């Protein structure tokens, strides 16, 4: 608000109001001041771990909660753990979402698949303004760092190399 900046926050709607999470009052105030809110499902459980009915419930009920609390349509979903299948995409579209986001770091272009969009994620914990600015202005470079770090970090013999690549 102070800097007149906007962004999108993805809510795990069953977590709203829990200690360490936003309250619906905070969400509403932020929404009224230009922040956008999307769904990150009810429970944050990967959608591909549910049967179709469970998937549908997570998608529809989370979307309804955001829309009811904010009085605005909810068009965005961030897939928990970035995981999705053809069935997840079908249920996402059926639930009325227009855009789906992964956990991959990167910028979005007009030609991108609207249900497989990269983002510039910020997870829990403090983030300095300098780090925030770096992530936004250098998101393409940041994406390369993130992907390189993840690639090298998952193999035992390259873990030492991963430690030399800064996590964006």
Locate predicted features.
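Short, catalytically relevant binding-site loops at active-site mouths
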Residues: 14-17, 43-45, 83-84
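Catalytic domains that recognize anionic headgroups
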Residues: 6-9, 42, 71-74
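Substrate-binding clefts and substrate-entry loops adjacent to catalytic sites
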Residues: 38-53
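C-terminal active-site subregion of NodB/CE4 polysaccharide deacetylases
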Residues: 1, 49-168
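Active-site beta->alpha N-cap acidic-glycine motif
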Residues: 1-33
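A cross-domain feature marking catalytic cores of carbohydrate-active enzymes
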Residues: 9-13, 39-41, 79-81, 119-121
């Amino acid at each position: 608000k102070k800097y007149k900046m906007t962004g999108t926050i993805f809510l795990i709607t069953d977590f709203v109001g829990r200690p360490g999470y936003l309250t619906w009052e905070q969400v509403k105030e932020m929404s009224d001041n230009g922040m956008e809110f999307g769904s990150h499902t009810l429970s944050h459980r990967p959608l591909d771990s549910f049967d179709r009915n469970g998937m549908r419930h997570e998608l529809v009920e989370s979307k309804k909660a955001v829309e009811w609390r904010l009085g605005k349509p909810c068009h965005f979903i961030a897939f928990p753990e970035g995981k999705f299948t053809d069935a997840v995409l079908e249920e996402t579209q059926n639930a009325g979402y227009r855009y789906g986001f992964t956990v991959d770091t990167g910028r979005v272009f007009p030609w991108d698949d609207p249900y497989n969009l990269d983002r510039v994620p910020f997870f829990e914990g403090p983030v300095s303004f300098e780090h925030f600015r770096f992530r936004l202005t250098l998101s393409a470079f940041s994406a390369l760092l993130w992907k390189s770090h993840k690639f090298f970090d998952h193999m035992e013999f390259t873990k030492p190399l991963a430690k030399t690549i800064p996590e964006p």
